[in-house]
Amino acid sequence: MALIIRIDVDRPYGKSPVGRHLLSRLSSDLWFPRINSFGYLKELQVILEMLNKRNARSYLFFRRCTLPSERIMQLIDDGQHQIGVHLENSRSFETFFQEKQLIERHTGKTVLALSKHGSGTARYGYHHYAPYEPDRYIDWARRSRMKVFFGNLEDPSIRPNSGVNGFMAFPSAFWLEPDWRDTSLFPVDWLLSEARKSDVVLLLHPENVLEKPELAEEFARLVAELPTKILS
């Protein structure tokens, strides 16, 4: 049994300082070029380097504004990570499929994993459709011959659902950031114990983890002590 690492790549330029936060908003709502010298996906690069040193694999979920640069793609290939769609415009199957095709064209890879940007409480950007409707996403993923859906619930004890042709749906995750986790019920030690008995999804956002040294230390500990897994 193992840790299934899910990384949601939400912000192209992070959220601090203020200038990079503004570039992230501009990229999300309108357009801004991918400029490495401005720190494009800088936090993701750090996380991937940490993972690759440990031979730990992960799922990386990209938005239309966080498409991987050449440098990030090299780290992805080196670590054999999997690319997924972090769905924004979930109004219809057609809008979902457009985002899937966008990421596949950009990366040159078949995308087999799906997650949803936001949990239904707020709208995050011009292209974002806020309602959270996991049953629809699971149906779309199956129709598109994808392999796995990762949901946004916050109770990591909820078990995954398996379907036809090996499709898997994980309704919930262990959110590394404590704002989305009941830390009294699910401390990091719970995850260390549980992931030795069953597969558990660990969800994180690079800019949030690296912003707080204690989260970065917890992440490093988890990757060092637990095996990681990509679903075949």
For every predicted segment, state its role.
Residues 1-168, 183-202, 209-232:
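Catalytic alpha-helical scaffold of carbohydrate-active enzymes acting on polysaccharides/glycoconjugates
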Residues 175-181:
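Eukaryotic low-complexity, charged/proline-rich intrinsically disordered regions
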